[in-house]
């Protein structure tokens, strides 16, 4: 969008002073705000409500606004934090429950990240769970990465953004949604009515009538649009409906012709979308009215902030610009005087660091898979952009340091009203970013080396073929995708070397990746899973397992292969739904109880036994999975449900021990560590946590000692049920990946040691744990560590197993337990000596073979000659092959070129190239020569100009590869010698 002509109410230019880079001047009519602090007015509740705000009613009215009133609204604080607060207050005053943003890591398995405000309400829209409130409002953190290349280039593309939304679950519908959207826009936010346009679905006459007759929007500013633009669907079938969008007009003076295009982003910006979920689309394409009509809306915070703050683009709002100002300071440039390329780089870094900070805060660490790859890719793009701005090191004198942590600190400083938990995790977030940046800088160096190699290869091939040298598009994409090398930089370096790039091939690879990204990020699917049908019309299961291990219950449903049945007999695999159960269903990292369902025989029913091996939850319905061991089970019959008490005790011990482990970790290595996953099993516990290095032996010992001391203190556990807000205020830690009821959560406390929100089963007293032992600590991903441990009965079994192993080891080595270490070290030393002796013998044998074949060397050239030897040495390993080549170079007269190959074992090829100084001086390099030969054997390699090694996996191709090496050497050397 070209903003050079945008008047935006004739906004004044914003002065940027490098001495005060965080200052933002919005307008003389708006509150001035700096990035260093939050306007105090944001924290204060309104003392009065405007008469224009109408209480929630089925007959909403829109009041006319006087010019004085409009000026009053426009003079309000329009900082991003204030806009967010005003939106939530607006809908709270109309009966909406204000709910917190959900995590960027969604519970929905169909999407990688939270991409829309409606995602946390998807089960309600599907009718899978009952609504807890009739309507709600949120400010949802969102991530979208399907259009990364446009970030920073357009006025409003982002990876991280906030979506303000109001939602109705069968409460109000189209009329109220439309009128409140208009009130919010023109009265609360004071947008001039003649600048707001609306779009509707082409067949939605109801929406047209509301906009025209009840709201009063002129017909020329209501645009009917087709299904592609204004009809929302969740997939081929399922909930769907028309939508209506609000657009802001930057140029009303251009008129209201029929051919006005709302997609013209030089004139319009869409800022509010209203989805009227009123139909169910059947398999045959029919639209059936939904019994419960829903409303799903989204207003982009960054977009409305751009409009209200009167700045040319989203990036210059107070939500993002303070971050840009910090980056400008690090780069020692002025944003206002920077060229377009530099401005784009500043915007990209600011945008990506917002996304990275909130993703890491929500438990996503950089890695090569899934969400972790998103974080890694964003950090790498930010590092590259920083390099293009001339940012070296941390800009504090350390050229090998990282600059992104300073940017992250600014993001965290602005996070108070987006996610208050971010500041509590600041040290971990910053450290993960620092480590990833430093790691990538090393990768970038390797990428530069690879580019140099690829360009040399391109020039070498062109020299032989007499064609124009070019870099393959796949190679350019490899540099971009794996090493984070911008194609623009690749093109610049290539041009300097006289090499062009196959951009068509590069674009093909980019498009393939883009399609994959869009498939993973672009759609929120509303589909009713099979388990929803399985449990339809079944009441919630009453859980009795905290207080009892057995209970009488009634069979409500039986399922075989997901289909309901009335009766199952011996040998059947079955899923049993009961009205009440003592069985704990797998959740919160704790595995499910095992046990039995018994049916006693009497005059009316047959005796039966069902062995339960797993219990899962579908919402609040427990599904007992097992096998009928004897007899038959029928719907409606009464059973005795009995949990295996020994296995339950093992789970309880390991679950409480997990809580103690988290507390000990925080005490020993720092409060910033946080849980990233867990497993509570019968035989062990596993705890994943965010940390950037391995734990030292003394730290592990201290953790063990702390936990065993707490166990010895014999402290009674306390459990209580509290509102979520009260539990958090009390200091309770939330478990990773869990979603909590706002009104009621279970708190498990070991007084003075640990307090966590937890629905799992626990011991009554820490003494029941008996003992605790860490059995391993390792890294499982970048920034993620894992501890495995045993406690209670599993601890005793572990110790007994170790004792048994030691007894067998002592018997084998014929030493006492205290002498095992010395004996093993002596054996290892003897083994090393034997291996060295064997290696020396192999090398001597290879050297002997080399001496024998040296007479096969032939000469190339006439006036000046070079000796060439290309031979196969069967059954010679790579090290011995190297020794043979070194011997030949030292014994044959310079200049000499030697290439040797071998297949030392099945599916393995070893190659070596050794060129004397006389050959290298002609410009023939071993490192470059060996690569194409190795490719023929299904491998690769490289090295120095005088010596290189390579390998492969196709020994059957070795003879032809060596023949190719012989031909190429002769041709190349003949040409060099003239």
Curated annotation (Swiss-Prot):
Entry-linked PROSITE patterns: AA_TRNA_LIGASE_II_ALA
Domain of life: Eukaryota
Localization terms from the record: Plastid, Chloroplast; Mitochondrion
This protein's record includes keyword Oxidoreductase: no
Principal subcellular localization: plastid
Statement: the UniProt record of this protein carries the keyword Oxidoreductase: no
This enzyme's EC code(s): 6.1.1.7
Site of covalent link Glycyl lysine isopeptide (Lys-Gly) (interchain with G-Cter in ubiquitin): 773
EC class of the enzyme, as a word: ligase
Consequence of gene disruption: Embryo defective. Developmental arrest of the embryo at early cotyledon stage.
Cofactor or coenzyme needed: Zn(2+)
Signal peptide residues on this chain, from the entry's feature table: none
Residues bound to Zn(2+): 655, 659, 758, 762
Single GO cellular component term: mitochondrion
Catalysed transformations (reactions): tRNA(Ala) + L-alanine + ATP = L-alanyl-tRNA(Ala) + AMP + diphosphate
UniProt similarity note: Belongs to the class-II aminoacyl-tRNA synthetase family.
Function statement: Catalyzes the attachment of alanine to tRNA(Ala) in a two-step reaction: alanine is first activated by ATP to form Ala-AMP and then transferred to the acceptor end of tRNA(Ala). Also edits incorrectly charged tRNA(Ala) via its editing domain.
Record remark on domains: Consists of three domains; the N-terminal catalytic domain, the editing domain and the C-terminal C-Ala domain. The editing domain removes incorrectly charged amino acids, while the C-Ala domain, along with tRNA(Ala), serves as a bridge to cooperatively bring together the editing and aminoacylation centers thus stimulating deacylation of misacylated tRNAs.
Subunit structure and binding partners: Monomer.
Protein name per UniProt: Alanine--tRNA ligase, chloroplastic/mitochondrial
Annotated organism of origin: Arabidopsis thaliana (Mouse-ear cress)
């Amino acid at each position: 969008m070209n903003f050079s002509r945008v008047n935006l109410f004739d906004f004044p230019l914003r002065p940027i002073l490098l001495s005060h880079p965080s200052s933002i001047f919005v307008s003389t009519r708006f509150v001035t705000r700096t990035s260093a602090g939050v306007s105090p007015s944001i924290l204060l509740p309104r003392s009065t409500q405007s008469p224009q705000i109408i209480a929630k009613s089925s007959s909403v009215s829109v009041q006319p606004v006087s010019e004085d009133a409009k000026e009053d609204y426009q003079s309000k604080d329009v900082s991003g934090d204030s806009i967010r607060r005003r939106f939530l207050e607006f809908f709270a005053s109309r009966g909406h429950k204000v709910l917190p943003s959900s995590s960027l890591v969604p519970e929905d398995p169909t999407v990688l990240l939270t991409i829309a405000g409606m995602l946390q309400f998807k089960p309600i829209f599907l009718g899978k769970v009952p609504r807890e409130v009739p309507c709600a409002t949120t400010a949802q953190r969102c991530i979208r990465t399907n259009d990364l290349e446009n970030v920073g280039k357009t006025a409003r593309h982002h990876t991280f953004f906030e979506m303000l939304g109001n939602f109705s679950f069968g409460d109000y519908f189209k009329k109220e949604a439309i009128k409140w959207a208009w009130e919010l826009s023109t009265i609360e936010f004071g947008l001039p009515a003649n600048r707001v346009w609306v779009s509707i679905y082409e067949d939605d006459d109801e929406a047209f009538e509301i906009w025209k007759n009840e709201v009063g929007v002129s017909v020329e500013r209501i645009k009917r649009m087709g299904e592609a633009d204004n009809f929302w669907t969740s997939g081929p079938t399922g909930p769907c409906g028309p939508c209506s969008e609000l657009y802001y007009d930057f140029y009303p003076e251009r008129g209201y012709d029929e051919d006005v295009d709302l997609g013209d982003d030089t004139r319009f910006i869409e800022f509010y979308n209203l989805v009227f979920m009123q139909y169910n689309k059947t398999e045959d394409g029919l639209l059936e009215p939904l019994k419960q009509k829903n409303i799903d809306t989204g207003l982009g915070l960054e977009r409305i902030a751009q409009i209200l703050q009167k700045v040319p683009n989203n990036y210059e709002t107070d939500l993002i610009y303070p971050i840009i100002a910090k980056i400008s300071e690090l780069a020692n440039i002025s944003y206002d005087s920077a060229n377009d390329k530099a401005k784009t780089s500043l915007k990209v870094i600011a945008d990506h660091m917002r996304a990275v900070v909130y993703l890491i805060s929500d438990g996503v660490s950089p890695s090569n898979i899934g969400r972790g790859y998103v974080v890694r890719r964003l950090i790498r793009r930010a590092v590259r952009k920083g390099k293009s701005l001339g940012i070296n090191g941390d800009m504090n004198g350390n050229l090998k340091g990282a600059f992104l942590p300073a940017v992250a600190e600014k993001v965290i400083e602005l996070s108070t009203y987006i996610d208050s938990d971010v500041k509590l995790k600041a040290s971990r977030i910053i450290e993960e970013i620092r480590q990833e940046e430093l790691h990538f800088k090393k990768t970038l160096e390797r990428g530069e080396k690879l580019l140099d190699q690829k360009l040399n290869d391109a020039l070498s091939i062109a020299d032989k073929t007499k064609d124009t040298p070019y870099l393959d598009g796949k190679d350019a994409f490899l540099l971009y995708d794996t090493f984070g090398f911008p194609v623009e930089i690749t093109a610049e370096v290539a041009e300097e070397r006289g090499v062009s790039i196959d951009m068509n091939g590069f674009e093909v690879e980019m498009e393939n990746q883009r399609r994959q990204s869009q498939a993973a990020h672009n759609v929120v699917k509303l589909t009713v899973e099979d388990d929803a049908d399985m449990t339809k019309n079944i009441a919630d299961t009453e859980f009795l397992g905290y207080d009892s291990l057995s209970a009488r219950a009634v069979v409500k449903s039986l399922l075989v292969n997901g289909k309901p049945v009335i009766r199952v007999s011996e040998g059947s695999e079955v899923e049993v739904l009961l009205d009440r159960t003592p069985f704990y269903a797998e959740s919160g990292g704790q595995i499910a109880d095992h046990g039995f369902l018994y049916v006693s025989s009497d005059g009316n029913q047959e005796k039966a036994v069902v062995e339960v091996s797993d219990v899962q939850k579908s919402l609040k319905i427990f599904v007992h999975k097992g096998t009928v061991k004897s007899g038959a089970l029928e719907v409606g019959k009464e059973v005795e449900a009995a949990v295996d008490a020994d296995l339950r005790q093992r789970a309880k011990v390991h679950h409480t021990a997990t809580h103690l482990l988290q507390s000990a970790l925080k005490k020993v290595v720092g409060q910033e560590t946080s849980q990233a996953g867990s497993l509570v099993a019968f035989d062990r516990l596993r705890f994943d946590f965010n940390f950037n290095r391995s734990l030292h032996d003394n730290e592990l010992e201290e953790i063990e000692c702390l936990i065993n001391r707490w166990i010895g203190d014999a402290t009674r556990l306390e459990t209580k049920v509290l509102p979520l807000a009260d539990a958090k205020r009390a200091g309770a830690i939330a478990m990773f990946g869990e979603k909590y009821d706002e009104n009621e959560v279970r708190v498990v406390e070991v007084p003075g040691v640990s307090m966590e929100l937890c629905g799992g089963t626990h011991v009554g007293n820490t003494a029941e744990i008996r003992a605790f032992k860490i059995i391993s600590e390792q890294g499982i991903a970048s920034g993620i560590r894992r501890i495995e441990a045993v406690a209670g009965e599993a601890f005793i079994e572990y110790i007994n197993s170790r004792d048994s192993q030691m007894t067998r080891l002592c018997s084998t080595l014929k030493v006492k337990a205290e002498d095992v270490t010395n004996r093993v070290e002596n054996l290892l030393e003897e083994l090393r000596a034997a291996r060295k002796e064997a290696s020396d013998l192999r090398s001597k044998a290879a050297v002997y073979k080399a001496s024998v074949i040296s007479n096969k060397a032939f000469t190339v050239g006439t006036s000046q000659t070079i000796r060439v030897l290309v031979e196969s040495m069967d059954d010679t390993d790579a090290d011995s092959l190297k020794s043979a080549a070194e011997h030949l170079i030292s014994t044959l007269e310079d200049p000499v070129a030697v290439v040797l190959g071998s297949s030392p074992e099945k599916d393995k090829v070893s190659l070596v190239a050794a060129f004397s100084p006389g050959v290298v001086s002609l410009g023939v390099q071993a490192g470059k020569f060996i690569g194409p030969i190795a490719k023929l054997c299904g491998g690769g390699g490289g090295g120095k100009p005088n010596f290189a090694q390579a390998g492969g996996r196709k020994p059957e191709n070795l003879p032809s590869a060596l023949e190719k090496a012989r031909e190429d050497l002769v041709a190349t050397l003949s040409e060099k010698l003239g």
